[in-house]
Every structure is written in structure tokens, then in C-alpha cells.
Amino acid sequence: MEAVIKAVLTGYPGETSKKDSKKKPPATSKKDPEKTPLLPTRVNYILIIGVLVLCEVTGVRADVHLLEQPGNLWITWASRTGQTDFCLSTQSATSPFQTCLIGIPSPISEGDFKGYVSDNCTTLEPHRLVSRGIPGGPENSTTLTYQKVSCLLLKLNVSLLDEPSELQLLGSQSLPNITNITRIPSVAGGCIGFTPYDSPAGVYGWDRREVTHILLTDPGNNPFFDKASNSSKPFTVVTADRHNLFMGSEYCGAYGYRFWEMYNCSQMRQNWSICQDVWGRGPPENWCTSTGGTWVNQSKEFNETEPFSFTVNCTGSNLGNVSGCCGEPITILPPEAWVDSTQGSFTKPKALPPAIFLICGDRAWQGIPSRPVGGPCYLGKLTMLAPNHTDILKILANSSRTGIRRKRSVSHLDDTCSDEVQLWGPTARIFASILAPGVAAAQALKEIERLACWSVKQANLTTSLLGDLLDDVTSIRHAVLQNRAAIDFLLLAHGHGCEDVAGMCCFNLSDHSESIQKKFQLMKEHVNKIGVDSDPIGSWLRGLFGGIGEWAVHLLKGLLLGLVVILLLVVCLPCLLQIVCGNIRKMINNSISYHTEYKKLQKAYGQPESRIV
């Protein structure tokens, strides 16, 4: 039965008869068996019918389990990584997706972890420039970032249902060096490591495959090994794939100043020595000097001048023997930077706050995997290797600009404006131009306003229509790219390369979205060029005097109005005075002439002059 089912699924039975084995394969069958289609060939259709009949007769039912759909892959990508751009790279069939993201260190604050940790990390042991085990050292101390990071990771209390997805990065940025003990960058000294023991895990080295091999093949050195089930509990080696590029002070940052410590080194067996929990070949003094320390016999005094003058007295008697190493710790990371991954908080995968990732060289997780081992790692964020066009525009828009030109106070046309254009005919234009030029000019301005209203409404309808079409084209484009990416992924995962499917490696999809967006924006800006200048005097004053306030504009308008009134009075007052004087003179002349005529009439009729009223 199993052989029949295998033959149905693969097209090759489990065992071949001798008669069939003597047959030569056809000349056209030169493909790799791994690339054989999963569906049966035409010859096996009879076997399919036989299996179906057999299942119906025996009552065997094949239940179909519908898996819950996880949602859109790219929406999940964007929400988890905080990125809207990505690229696909068909580098290998085993990992066809390669992101264009890189890791960058980010300052860590307890406010970012609100709701994700069980307690705060306010009381952290400071890192002294000279340890308390060395008498006479200065009371200078600082808190490096790794102490806060390790404390927060140990207090994570939000568990994940599944292991966090791993992201393959192009790389990650190294941490800055500590060049001034009094001004340490906020992300300096943020590297941590994960060890299944209470001591530093320098014994594992940094090779991911080597660490995995040791933990899987040597149960004695594997703290995750369960003797009852004779198997190891699942663990995750978080060391970078290209570990030689992401290790040591080149990646975690170098301490520009020596952090003096005193620790014991002794020779345990032939050609093997141990210094502070780290084993190595050779005598212990070689270990000490190779890591920047100084071998001490009984006592030695060191005079330091950086970052300030002080004296360090390293005494071997403090170690309980007559010799030791005085200087930097010999591990790549300080002992406090190693997090014990056997603690209860790491038995299950833990969630990190949004947009915060565990970055380990060229690998990243949006969470802490269960039982992590290796390093070095730090908490940071992901970004594109180069900013895209949208990010560049945002940066330029938010940058400080000088000499900003203020726009005129032009208001856009209202939606309720009249767009009914009724032009006059030739006869009306001729008679209006000859008999009433003012009426013709007013009618022309009215029709121009209606034409502007019609143009704005027409342009708004056009841009709205093009915007809807552009949204449809964008959604179709995204669907095509998503389907093509899914098809390529499935083909590569099943070992089918470019030579199997025509046009697979070359997929040309024209992209004029940037040009369309620019033209679409130009259309919107072109519509906004039609407007009504409701305050021409204020606009003229703003353009004349630059960026003045509104109160100054109103003041200048008042002064300008008063000046215009004064000018009008100066121009018109002589005329008014002349007219008034002329009228007065005319009245006087009329009165004198009337009196003269009256006297003549009196003389003519001989009436006495005294009776004149």
C-alpha cells in the first residue's frame, strides 16, 4: 500500500521489478529526480482510480484539515518591520528571499518596554573605570548599555505562541567606540550574548555550526539535554551566519579607556590554562598579555593619564595566590553582558515592543527565541540600505529652509460658483461696445469668472477620475507582484530554476508610477493656480515688505488710506476753492447788477429812493 501511495505521489514505486529494472530509461528523461513533478504521469492514472476504489471499499476516509490563513504576507511584513519597501533576491533555492534591510543600533529606554516587562531596571550596578577589587582606584563609574539591555531581557513577560520569524539582513551597523568616559554615546556598549551557563560562553567561539555541533553531540556540555527523554530541548543559536564579520571590538565597539579589573589565571593541566572561566592553550601569562592585560607577580603599580591621572595598584594577594592578570577582561564581552538563557524567562519565546528587533550581525528577530545561545547581539531597529524616494522627499520637506516666499492671500473658487457660461453674440458685443463700454467690460469680467469656475470644476473631476484609475492600477500591480513572488518562491523551493520555466528569471513589468504621480500632482497644482484675490492691497504690501505680520498689514493699509485721502484733498481742494469762489463772485455780481437795475427803474418812474426795501 505504501509503495502504491508513493508511486501515486512521486511517479516512482518503492521497489522495481527485475523486468522493469532491465529496461533502459527513455532518452528524454535526463532531469534530476528532485525536479520530477509531484503529480503522477498519465500511466499512473489507473493506480489513482484503484486507490480511490480501495479507500471507498475499506471505508478509509481522508480528512482534509483546513489551516487558518495567516493573513497577507506583505501587510504582516510591514507591520512587523515598520518598513513599506522590500526587495526579493533569488540567490539560492533554499532561501530565495533576501531582504534589503540592515540593522542599526537604537537608544533603549524603559518607556519603550512598558507593558512588556514585569519590573523596572532603575537600579543597575555601575561599571567602574577601576574595579573595587583594585585598591586605590578613582571613584569613577558609568552605566553601559548592555546592563540595561540584559536587565530588560530578563524581565520580559509577554510570551509568543510560536518562535519569532528570522529575517536575513544584508548586515548591521557596528556600535560606536567609547572615546571619552565622561561622554559615552547612548548606544555604546550595547552588545550582549546568550550563554546556557552562569559564566561567559567564550568557550563556544563564534561559529554557528560549531556551537550547534557541540550542543547536539555532547550532552555533557548541553544544559538543555533532557536525560528522561534522551533528547535536547529546542534551542536557537543566534550567532551571525558570517560570524567573522560581526564579532569583537570591530562590531561591538572598542573601549578607548582600559577598564581595570583583577582576575585569577592559573595553569590547570599541561598546555592548558584558565583565566576567569575561559579555557585556552598555552601558559596563563600569554592569555593575559594577548588580551591587553598585564601579568602581575605579587604586586605592580600602574600610572594612568587617560582620561585623567590616577594610580592603579594591582596586588596578586587579592586573588589568593601570588600571580594574576590585571587589565581588561579576556572575554569579548564583559561577564555581565552574558545573559543566562537557562532561566525561566527564556524557556518560551518572548515578544519585543514594536519596531524593536534583536539584531545579531546579519540576522534579526522581532522577539527573543526560546533558549538563545551565542552572539553578539544588540537591540535596535531595521532600515533600508539606502533611503527610497519617499523618504528623501520627507527629509527635504522637514529640513530647515531659509528665505521662504509667502503666498498671496488668494482664496480658491467655491464649489457653489456659477459655471454657466453664456457668451454674447456679435450684435450685442458691437452695440454694447459703442453705446455702453462699461457694461461690456462688466459682462466680459463676469463671463471670465464663470469660465474659471467651469475650468476648476472640470479639472477637479478629471483629477478625481485619474486618481481612482491610479488606485486601481496600483492595486493590480501589487497583486501581480505578489502572485509572481509567490510563484517564484514555490518554484525555487521545489528546485525549479530559470531553465525550467520560460521567463522566470526575467520579469518585465513597466513602472510609470513615479511619472504618473508627478503629473497627477502637477494637475492638482495647476488647478490651484485659478483663484480669487480677495485682498489685493494686502497681497501687494506683503510682497513689498516681505514676511510682515497681519497687524502691520492692517496698520499700513490704514496709513495708505489716510495718505490717499490727503492726496485727494490736496489735488481736489484748489478746484473746490475755485468753484466756491466763482459761485460767490457770481452771487455778488448778480446782487450788484440787480441793485443797479432797480435804481434805474426808480429814476425812470420817479419813485423816492427811501421806499426801497
Swiss-Prot record:
Glycosylation sites: 120, 140, 157, 177, 230, 264, 271, 297, 303, 313, 321, 388, 398, 460, 508, 589
Disulphide connectivity of cysteines: 87-506, 121-151, 191-252, 265-275, 360-377, 417-453, 498-505
Signal peptide: 1-62
Matching Pfam families: Avian_gp85, TLV_coat
Keywords assigned by UniProt, alphabetized: Disulfide bond, Fusion of virus membrane with host cell membrane, Fusion of virus membrane with host membrane, Glycoprotein, Host cell membrane, Host membrane, Host-virus interaction, Lipoprotein, Membrane, Palmitate, Signal, Transmembrane, Transmembrane helix, Viral attachment to host cell, Viral penetration into host cytoplasm, Virion, Virus entry into host cell
Region (Disordered): 14-36
Lipid attachment, kind S-palmitoyl cysteine: 572, 575
Extracellular side: 63-559, 581-613
Immunosuppression as annotated region, ranges: 481-497
Location of the region described as Binding to host receptor in the Swiss-Prot/TrEMBL record: 184-233, 268-294
Biological processes per GO annotation: fusion of virus membrane with host plasma membrane; symbiont entry into host cell; virion attachment to host cell
Region (Fusion peptide): 425-445
Transmembrane residue ranges: 560-580
Annotated Gene Ontology cellular component terms: host cell plasma membrane; membrane; virion membrane
Residues under site feature: Cleavage: 408-409
PANTHER family cross-referenced by the UniProt entry: ENDOGENOUS RETROVIRUS GROUP FC1 ENV POLYPROTEIN-RELATED, VIRAL ENVELOPE PROTEIN
Family label: Belongs to the Alpharetroviruses envelope glycoprotein family.
This protein's name: Envelope glycoprotein gp95
Organism, scientific name: Rous sarcoma virus subgroup B (strain Schmidt-Ruppin)
The encoding gene: env
